[in-house]
Amino acid sequence: MQELHVKSLLPVRLDKYLMEQYPCLGPGRLNKALRENKIKLNGKKQPLSTRVQNGDVVRIYLLDEQLGLLPQDGPAFLAARAPAEFIYENNELIVANKPAGIPVDGGEADTLLNRVLRRLYEEQRYDAAHPPRLCHRLDTGTSGLVLLAKTSEAEHFLVESIRERKIRKTYLCVTFGRPMPPAATLHSFLTKDSVNGIVRVLDEPKSGAKEIITGYDTIAVSGRLALLRVELVTGRTHQIRAHLASIGCPILGDSKYGNNAANRELKLKYQALCAWELAFPRQISDPRFASLAGKVFRAPKPWYYEQVMNGTLR
């Protein structure tokens, strides 16, 4: 916890003041901290738009490393808690395994990108002029595979392959509720609610809505829960989470779209959703990436997979 005694002669917004004190904090991290009651102004939770002035006391309940206060010998990414786990690597790309609970990038010290850079640095393979670049994203609470490009050519190839749906993405998840039918392909439309930070699923198209397609099949059931294999055909924000919730089967542990009573009962901190498999097309015309043709990469099965299979989690 850090306690700040404001000495500003002119009133300034709380969020601007905190970002001036801790440059590594961005708007997203501040909003999350406020939602989690980790920011107090004069002992009370206040909106980030509140103006602070001389004499005010601000307390922020974040770790020193989250505030960028730990001394570093070397690049800032060494503050990441651990080096990344690589599922696969060649001269063009890295397939990294992201744990649930860390963002892929952003202002925090412990991100997937920083873990990747830390691993390369510790193995004396880090090139500051040509660092690897993220080609897609996962939500903070989602675990699983993320592609990073080592070259600009690989970045273009991977981003375009994802955009054109040439790389098949398969997820594993546990839902609260058994979907009926046990296997289906869902077609809907999605709009963003930027004010509340969520998306909404619609049955019919409307202005600004984007088509979403999600396929699923049931691997196993345990009590009120179902273990699903999900194919992400389109890749929109929160698509799997919102789409499954729209049919009455929210993902276990999901605080935005899920059953919070069940989440509390089972003491789940993050959504039970894993980006489990990335499958490249059987034919790749570009000779620079032909070695990837037909390759399938898989993350280790998440902890909840076996617990649903054997009935421990139900």
Q: For the regions a protein language model found, what residue spans apply to each?
A:
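RNA pseudouridine synthases
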Residues: 1-194, 221, 298-308
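Short Pro/Gly-enriched beta-strand edge/turn motifs at strand-loop
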Residues: 67-69, 196-199, 211, 257-262
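Short, surface-exposed secondary-structure edge patches
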Residues: 47-51, 229, 270
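Long C-terminal interaction/binding lobes of large macromolecular proteins
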Residues: 216
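Pseudouridine synthases involved in rRNA/tRNA modification
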Residues: 1-32, 79-84, 206-210, 223, ...
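Short histidine-centered loop motifs in beta-beta connectors
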Residues: 43, 223, 228-231
